[in-house]
Amino acid sequence: MRKTIAFHIPSLIGGGAERVICNLANHFAEEGYRVSMITSEMEDHQYYQLDEHVTRVVLPKPTGNRILKIFRRLGILRKAIRDSEAPVVVSFIGMANLRAILATRFMKTKVIVSVRSAPGREYKGKEKLAKFLFRFAEGAVFQTGMARDYFPGTVRRKSTILMNPLLGDFSRARYEGQREKEIVTVGRLHPVKNHEMLIRAFARFHQDYPDYVLRIYGDGENRTKLEELIQELACGESVFLEGNCDAVADAIWKASLFVLTSNTEGMPNALLEAMALGLPCISTDCPCGGPAALIRDGENGLLIPVGDEDALVDAMERILSEKDFAEKLGRSAEQAKEQYAPEKIYQMWEDYITEVADR
């Protein structure tokens, strides 16, 4: 009998979690599974490509007052999961996890929830509800030990930690030529990414290293605020908001340094990808521990405290003034492409899903 699996996420708009769940669905389809991708929002938007053999199910919006909508939404999701005939449904992100648990109560379908960022932020205002409901999920996937430790022992004991796979064109050989005098970062322009600190730190750094430029790839709600900051600091000729980029590997491959200044992160794909390309990297040591899981401070990158502009300036100056140190960090970082190879990560997912299904 053909194996069947369902995935549930609010939408397929651009984002790290959306990319991972789409690639997981595509992998299982390629392995011969019958795959359903169930979404509940943004039906007209799909940033990432799904395999033609993945069935896309967009849930109709519930009607009625606020209370009725809650119950009708659960009923609609329950029917979609039942219609998929999947013995296991894997859900990603916040409320989708909680809805999947509630929608499958007293069904034979087993639920694996996946937390993709700091749980305290992902479930802000719903912390007690999440900790309670997660006990009824048959499995849970976290990206870091810090995220897993947020939940009670009943959840931790049936969970696993699975990192993100390295996808796309980031497994290419490290660039060995003369590097461009560019500092780069990749991520949506959102307050949690704290690009303000990066821009302010770069403006200070630039006073002593005027040949360097900062390129920020990504777009989002914070763009206007960042443009105003760039104007305020009079660094419009050295700081560039490049917008979304379809060829990130090409854009950053020859850069001298990658910097991540987030206040919180799950497992930061952008940092993993920059490391795999062999770039020297700096990251904040932010919750829920994703950067610290990737970077061994001083060996394959540098970690700095969250929000510490002075530490960032010092780290940038150290790496870009000590070529041997930068070379060491970059070559050590490049090993990430072996550790996070897609075939390894997908097999770990498949093994865990099979284990949960067989419990």
Q: Where on the chain are the PLM-derived regions?
A:
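Aromatic "clamp/platform" in nucleotide-sugar-dependent glycosyltransferases that forms part
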Residues: N244, N263
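N-terminal strand-loop element at the rim of the active site
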Residues: R2, F7-G15, R19-L68, P152, ...
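Short hydrophobic beta-strand element within catalytic cores of glycosyltransferases
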Residues: P280-D285
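A conserved, positively charged/aromatic
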Residues: R105, V111-V141, G153-T154
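Short His-centered aromatic/hydrophobic patch
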Residues: S91-N97, V115
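A conserved mid-protein helix/loop that constitutes part of the nucleotide-sugar donor-binding site
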Residues: E18-N23, K181, R188-Y209, E221-E228, ...
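Conserved acidic donor-binding segment of nucleotide-sugar-dependent glycosyltransferases
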Residues: R296-G298, L302-E309, E317-K323
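Donor nucleotide-sugar binding/catalytic pocket of nucleotide-sugar-dependent glycosyltransferases
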Residues: R135-S171, T185
